[in-house]
């Protein structure tokens, strides 16, 4: 073949180096330090507000600046949390019937779930959703988390800030200073949140999974308590979440920063003794969150396909008899 053989091998080598898998890896490496900033600072910071007592009470403006209201056709549907200027974390079951991103908006920076029509500040903190990414790694398990990619970049201020996220090596158990927030109903009988529909907060304790499995064994649901979820609340039922809180964050204070540990997922009733709420374990899905943000953070042309086309077109000439 003369010199044509080495040329062909060189082109084929270029194709292999440019294959889609390696493109994703190089994309991940490039974007980790630019578009994603999942662990970048500052995060998990909030206004200095006086601590409140435990037990399902109204919150204060700016106390949980990462809190998001996911709105379906202009009405609050689920909670969520701001991870970065373009990404919101929430529960997958919120989109069981409504996966069209055009039907959703995300409200940030508001204490109420029903801001006044004349509240211009509320509209400046409302963002359209570009993509809804639901975790579907294993259909046999819940994997109850989803990412929303916003159509435009969020403007940070004192009332809008991202929450921190811990990597997969983090353990959520034995965290004493944890809170969950939401606009859900107040009781199991669906007693609605009264005007002015302010965000509520409650301090919760995280149970170890073996204890949680014991509590849910009576309903034959103990097999659902695996490493991708955890239980939190109060065993006497005094601290819990309910309908409308789904997708909202459970956060813990560590060294002065707030980290999201869980996502409100499911439970049996609301506030029942010995039946704590079930939360998606965020750190368990850290790698999935990071990967989805990287792969959807920026779209680059895949050079492997046109390069492969050139190689194949030139192959007959390169291999022709000399």
Curated annotation (Swiss-Prot):
Residues 1-19 form the signal peptide. The active site is at 93 (charge relay system), 144 (charge relay system), 246 (charge relay system). Its EC number is 3.4.21.-. Glycans are attached at residue 47. Keywords: Cell membrane, Disulfide bond, Glycoprotein, GPI-anchor, Hydrolase, Lipoprotein, Membrane, Protease, Serine protease, Signal. It is found in: Cell membrane. The keyword Transmembrane does not apply. It is an enzyme of class 3 (hydrolase). The keyword NADP does not apply. SMART domains: Tryp_SPc (SM00020). Residues 20-52, 297-322 form a propeptide. Its main location: membrane. N-glycosylated. GO terms for biological process: proteolysis. A lipid is attached at residue 296 (GPI-anchor amidated asparagine). It is a lipid-anchor; GPI-anchor. This is Serine protease 41.
């Amino acid at each position: 073949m003369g010199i044509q053989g080495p040329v062909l091998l060189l082109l084929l080598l270029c194709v292999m180096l440019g294959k889609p898998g390696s493109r994703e890896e190089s994309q991940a490496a490039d974007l980790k330090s630019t578009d994603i900033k999942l662990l970048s600072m500052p995060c998990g910071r909030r206004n200095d507000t006086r601590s409140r007592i435990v037990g399902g009470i109204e919150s204060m403006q700016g106390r949980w600046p990462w809190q998001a209201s996911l709105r379906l056709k202009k009405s609050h549907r689920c909670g969520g949390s701001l991870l970065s200027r373009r990404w919101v974390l929430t529960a997958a079951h919120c989109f069981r019937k409504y996966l069209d991103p055009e039907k959703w908006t995300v409200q940030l920076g508001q204490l109420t779930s029903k801001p006044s029509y004349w509240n211009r500040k509320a509209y400046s903190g409302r963002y359209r959703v570009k993509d809804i990414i639901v975790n579907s790694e294993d259909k046999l398990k819940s994997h109850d988390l989803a990412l929303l990619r916003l159509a435009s970049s969020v403007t940070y201020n004192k009332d809008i800030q991202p929450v921190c996220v811990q990597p997969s090596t983090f353990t959520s158990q034995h965290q004493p200073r944890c809170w969950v927030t939401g606009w859900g109903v107040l009781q199991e009988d669906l007693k609605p949140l009264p005007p002015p529909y302010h965000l509520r907060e409650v301090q919760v304790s995280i149970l170890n999974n073996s204890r949680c499995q014991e509590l849910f064994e009576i309903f034959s649901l103990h097999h659902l308590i695996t490493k991708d979820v955890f239980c939190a609340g109060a065993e006497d039922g005094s601290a819990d979440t309910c309908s409308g809180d789904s997708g909202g964050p459970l956060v813990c204070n560590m060294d002065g920063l707030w980290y999201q540990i869980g996502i409100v997922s499911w439970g049996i009733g609301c506030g029942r003794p010995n039946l704590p709420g079930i939360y998606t374990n965020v750190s368990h899905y850290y790698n999935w969150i990071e990967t989805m943000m990287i792969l959807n953070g920026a779209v680059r042309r895949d050079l492997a396909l046109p390069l492969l086309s050139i190689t194949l077109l030139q192959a007959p000439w390169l291999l022709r008899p000399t």
